[in-house]
Amino acid sequence: MATYETFAAVYDAVMDDSLYDLWTDFSLRHLPKTKDKKKLLELACGTGIQSVRFSQAGFDVTGLDLSADMLKIAEKRASSAKQKIDFIEGNMLDLSRAGKYDFVTCYSDSICYMKDEVEVGDVFKEVYNALNEDGVFIFDVHSTYQTDEVFPGYSYHENAEDFAMLWDTYEDEAPHSIVHELTFFVQEEDGSFSRHDEVHEERTYEVLTYDILLEQAGFKSFKLFADFEDKEPTENSRRWFFVCEK
């Protein structure tokens, strides 16, 4: 059987590396790191690519993810890069044991995987409690334009020597929600290919909803940007960035 490491390699292979450069650059512009203020928690850190970049930029990084298998790969990646990073297996819906941080990030639209706005609000409350005073929380989500106009009917196919991937996206029932159907064909040790199917459900909300949920969590202010730039969103922006201050 193909291992989870295989799937992680597939994910990493099809992920656009330039996005990590953009996330890093955006973060460095908006996280006021100092000698005494550099503790950073990365939520949904996955295989640790972004965690390593934060560490290389001088942050004291902790990465949190639901998947123990993903974290094993993240630990290997950090070790290979000679970066000291703590990785925690955990859920962003419960950060009570995660410690305190100056900064928290949650990228790659991971907030959109929460099942409803109640869970989104719960994540915001958990992050608020995990932040030191004047701490900063940055997250990105799909815009409603992305979920309503861009994603429905989206289809992406990738073929490589040892794997193939089919990715199709459809509109879901709830407002601003989508379903990604992914099929992997992964080469086994004997040369044959095995098929694996995944379904990913995502949902975003109007900016006003995020505004209310952040305020209810206790954040005193936030700034809204779009598409990795320090500019306000337009009606055609695809990714919203929230920079929130405790």
Which residue ranges define each predicted feature?
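Conserved class I S-adenosyl-L-methionine
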Residues: 1-35, 37-46
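Class I SAM-dependent methyltransferase SAM/SAH-binding core
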Residues: 48-94
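A short acidic, Gly/Pro-enriched loop at the edge of an enzyme's catalytic core
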Residues: 93-103
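A short SAM/SAH-binding and catalytic strip from SAM-dependent methyltransferases
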Residues: 102-118
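A short glycine-rich, Lys/Arg-flanked "PGG" loop and its adjoining helix->strand segment in the class I
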Residues: 121-133
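C-terminal lobe and adjacent flexible extensions of AdoMet/dcAdoMet transferase-like proteins
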Residues: 201-246
